[in-house]
Amino acid sequence: MKAKKLPVLNDPIYGFIGIDSGIIFELLSHPFFQRLRRISQMGLSYLVYPGARHSRFEHALGAMHLMNKAVMVLRKKGIEISKAEKEALSIAILLHDIGHGPFSHALEECILIDTHHEALSLGYMELLNEQFDGKLSLAIQIFNGQYPRKFMGQLVASQLDIDRLDYLKRDSFYTGATEGNINTQRIIEMFFVVDDELVVEEKGLFSVEKFIMARRLMYWQVYLHKTGVAAELLLLSLIHI
């Protein structure tokens, strides 16, 4: 029987993104994940930046692509990462935002009080794990920060994680705010693991400093723009009427 050919997707930021396992393709095709096509990455920011109409779907794919790059770099430097761990890392980052609702963060605390999207993402992942006969168990451990190899959880969620590396570059591209255009490849190439912690080589410190400044400037200029914030407040007031 001929093996099923997995797709290659074209992304405006990174070029071609390969899908390298059957379960990743099945998760991409699942209705839970497909709904992210209709979830704005930047909420109401398109009212200020007309190009900012990209979705959580695109961001998740981009983050998965960067995760695969990070695994490749760490393996090249002698860090052992099994095939199962690589697949689990891809799944964890692919599904990290699956719990986002309409308008992304704008309605996060309005529809479900005291429930953040991370908790909803975990709920979706647990439902998917049941449907996929436990094949997401390792990914859930990594997502929860419960996996013994601490650096894997840090790749998914930390101060310098794959999520932030993608959204800064992607949001910069679609808004035209060049302050967020960080060198993701350079930062990933500087990744290393010491005492089971994710670290950056000394020669990569300048790139990390630029990343920190880029994030600060993007919040100041884009994410917390007064018009976008005002639009979110109006939306919340309409819901509360």
Model-derived features: where do they sit?
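Non-catalytic interface/linker regions that flank or bridge core catalytic/transmembrane domains
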Residues: 1-38
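Alpha-helical phosphate/pyrophosphate-handling elements in metalloenzyme active cores
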Residues: 42-44, 48-88
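Alpha-helical scaffolds flanking conserved acidic
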Residues: 79-93, 138-145, 151
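Histidine/acidic-rich helix-loop-helix segments that form or flank divalent-metal centers
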Residues: 127-217, 224-227
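Conserved small/polar residues in nucleotide/adenosyl-binding loops
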Residues: 239-241
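His-Asp-centered metal-binding catalytic motifs of divalent-metal-dependent phosphohydrolases/nucleases
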Residues: 63, 85-105, 121, 235
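Active-site flanking loop/helix segments enriched in acidic
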Residues: 20, 27, 35-58, 108, ...
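An active-site-proximal "capping" alpha-helix that borders the catalytic cofactor pocket
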Residues: 62-68, 116-129
